[in-house]
Amino acid sequence: MKRRDCLAALVGTALAARAQATLVGTPIEWPVIELLDGTTLAPAAWQGMAAVIVFWATHCPFCKRHNAHVEKLYRATKAQPLRVLTLAEDGNADLVRRYMRSHGYGFPVALSDGVLRRRMTTRRIIPMTCVVDRDARLRQAIPGEMSEDDVMGLAQAALRPPG
C-alpha cells in the first residue's frame, strides 16, 4: 500500500472516531416515537427520564442474545425513572411483532426511521446500545453484543448524576 493510501486511511479513521466522540455528551432532542403497540411517545414523555436505547434487527443473532438481556433490564427497572426503548432496523412491523412474540419479549419497540440513531451515533453496527441520562445527554454509545452483567449495569450508568 502506498504511503499516501495509508495516510488517507489513518486520517479517515481519526475523523470517524472524532465524529463519534463528539456525539457523547450532547443533548438528545427526542422525536415523536410511535411504538408497535400503538403507543405514541411525545418528546415531553422523556423529561426527567434516563433511557437505554437499543438499535437491532430480527436477522441478527447477536441482537437475539443481546435482547434477552435487554428484556431482563426492562423488567428489572420498570419502577425506576428509566425508559428502555428498542428500535428495530427491519422496516417491517409485522415481522418485528412476530419476532417479539416468538421470543417472549415485552420491552417497548418501534421501527427505526434513522432519526434517533443519527442523533446518537454515526456507527451503523447492530446491536447498538445508547445510554441517555436524565438531563437528556448522551452518555454512552456501545456497539455490539453485551454481557448480561454489562446490560444490567446500564441502569446505574443512566441514572448516575451527571458530572
What are these regions (language model features)?
Residues 101-105, 113-154:
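Thiol/disulfide oxidoreductase modules built on the thioredoxin-like
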Residues 64-103, 114-118:
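Structural microenvironment flanking redox-active thiols in thiol-disulfide oxidoreductases
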Residues 28-29, 51, 126-127:
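Short loop/turn microsegments at loop-to-beta-strand junctions
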Residues 45-61:
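Short active-site neighborhood of thiol/selenol oxidoreductases, capturing the structured segment around
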Residues 18-43:
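N-terminal "domain-start" segment that seeds a small globular fold
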Residues 4-21:
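N-terminal export signals
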Residues 16, 48, 145-147:
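A short acidic/small-residue loop/turn micro-motif
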